[in-house]
């Protein structure tokens, strides 16, 4: 049986590290020590320029398949501390819940991974293959010196990962209802439309950039980018800001600005979307400046037997039939697409990044059972599912 006490104790210890991205604040060393005591070979690598980000890769066992548990130990800031019921970096257990920043995203999943792996190793000395961990402290921010760099390093050393389970909070209503097998891309736009400043009483002597930018944005909103496909919802544009920096009521400003984002599926490339946006703008004006940045592109995991077997496993353990999904924000799963098949499966995502972030203890235990049985399925020749 996977120890409930161990799961909770590990989570409380992980929450105690104020690991606001990209500072792990000692959490990577803590996990390293746990893995080394269990017999893992662990490498801690630092990447970055002005600020060094810690990452770890540890493995136990030999040969293939290599089943990798991946995740991030960094968290978003706690926000207004006075709004929390309990101190955000001092995990509090109250009734059937555990509160703390990062409980859901994603220290809860990491504690479940560690607990289930340690239990599996203690109870199965003759398994075939390798168990590994890839943990970063750079996911919630720029994600420049975390998983991406670590995967490059791992493969330069000759290691091969056969299947990855990333513990992002994926489930919606109950543990088991959603498995992420891909993610949408995200492209940000920063638009400036130039007009001609003037007095509001003499509009014929000015060019109002507000009128132009409103027309442009309305046209972009009305534009149907695509219909979606089997695994992806339709691409979606959202306006996030409109501004002129003008507080004077009798002046027509010279510049109007807007920022907007498109979450897009694998029907499009970011270059194609940039072309669409430019053509739309130029229906109304050529006097503009447009900057764009694409942090992540859409991807769909390699649909290997590992992924379909994992889906069946989740159904057997949780008694819930999971759906494959590509919804939600971006994650480090994108970086694995060229290295191994990957699924994202973790806790409920409803409390991620929120004040009073919490998870149910029963959900942690269910997640442990899924992770444990995944190891049984992929590493034991005569695997049997555990329900406790």
Swiss-Prot record:
Please explain the role this protein plays, according to its UniProt record. Answer: Catalyzes the hydrolysis of N-succinyl-L,L-diaminopimelic acid (SDAP), forming succinate and LL-2,6-diaminopimelate (DAP), an intermediate involved in the bacterial biosynthesis of lysine and meso-diaminopimelic acid, an essential component of bacterial cell walls.
- Organism encoding this protein: Orientia tsutsugamushi (strain Boryong)
Top-rank taxon:
Bacteria
Reaction(s) catalyzed by this protein? N-succinyl-(2S,6S)-2,6-diaminopimelate + H2O = (2S,6S)-2,6-diaminopimelate + succinate
Any Pfam family matching the protein = Peptidase_M20
By what name is this protein known? Answer: Succinyl-diaminopimelate desuccinylase
Enzyme class, top EC level, equals: hydrolase
Please give the Gene Ontology molecular function terms for this protein. acetylornithine deacetylase activity; cobalt ion binding; succinyl-diaminopimelate desuccinylase activity; zinc ion binding
Question: By which gene is this protein encoded?
Answer: dapE
Give the positions the UniProt entry annotates as the active site. 74, 139
| Pathway annotation from the record | Amino-acid biosynthesis; L-lysine biosynthesis via DAP pathway; LL-2,6-diaminopimelate from (S)-tetrahydrodipicolinate (succinylase route): step 3/3
Please give the cofactor(s) recorded in the UniProt entry for this protein: Zn(2+); Co(2+)
Task: Return the cofactor note field.
Answer: Binds 2 Zn(2+) or Co(2+) ions per subunit.
Electron transport as a keyword of this entry, yes or no, is: no
């Amino acid at each position: 049986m996977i120890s409930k006490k161990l799961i909770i104790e590990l989570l409380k210890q992980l929450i105690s590290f104020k690991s606001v991205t990209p500072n792990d604040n000692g959490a990577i060393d803590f996990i390293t020590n746990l893995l080394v005591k269990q017999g893992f070979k662990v490498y801690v690598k630092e990447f970055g320029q002005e600020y060094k980000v810690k990452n770890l890769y540890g493995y136990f066992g030999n040969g293939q398949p290599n089943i990798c548990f991946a995740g991030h130990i960094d968290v978003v800031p706690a926000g207004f501390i006075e709004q929390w019921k309990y101190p955000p970096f001092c995990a509090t257990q109250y009734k059937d819940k555990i509160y703390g920043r990062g409980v859901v995203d994603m220290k809860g999943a990491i504690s479940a991974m560690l607990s289930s792996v340690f239990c599996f190793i203690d109870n199965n000395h003759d398994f075939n293959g390798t168990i590994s961990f890839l943990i970063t402290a750079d996911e919630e921010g720029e994600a420049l010196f975390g998983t991406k760099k670590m995967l490059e390093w791992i493969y330069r050393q000759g290691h091969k990962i056969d299947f990855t389970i990333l513990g992002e909070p994926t489930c919606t209503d109950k543990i088991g209802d959603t498995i992420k097998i891909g993610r949408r891309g995200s492209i940000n736009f920063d638009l400036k439309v130039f007009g001609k400043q003037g007095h509001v009483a003499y509009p014929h002597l000015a060019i109002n950039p507000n009128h132009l930018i409103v027309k442009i944005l309305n046209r972009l909103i009305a534009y149907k980018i695509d219909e979606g496909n089997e695994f992806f919802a339709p691409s979606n544009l959202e306006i996030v800001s409109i501004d002129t920096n003008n507080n004077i009521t009798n002046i027509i400003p010279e510049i109007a600005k807007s920022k907007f984002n498109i979450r897009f599926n694998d029907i499009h490339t970011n270059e194609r979307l940039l072309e669409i946006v430019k053509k739309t703008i130029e229906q109304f004006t050529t006097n503009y400046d447009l900057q764009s940045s694409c942090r992540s592109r859409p991807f769909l995991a390699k649909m290997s037997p590992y992924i379909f077997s994992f889906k069946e496993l989740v159904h057997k353990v949780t008694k819930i039939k999971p759906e494959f999904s590509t919804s939600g924000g971006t994650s480090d799963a994108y970086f694995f697409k060229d290295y191994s098949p990957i699924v994202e499966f973790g806790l409920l995502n409803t409390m991620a990044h929120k004040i009073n972030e919490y998870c149910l203890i029963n959900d942690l235990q269910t997640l442990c059972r899924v992770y444990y049985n995944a190891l049984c399925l992929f590493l034991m020749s005569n695997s049997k599912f555990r329900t406790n």
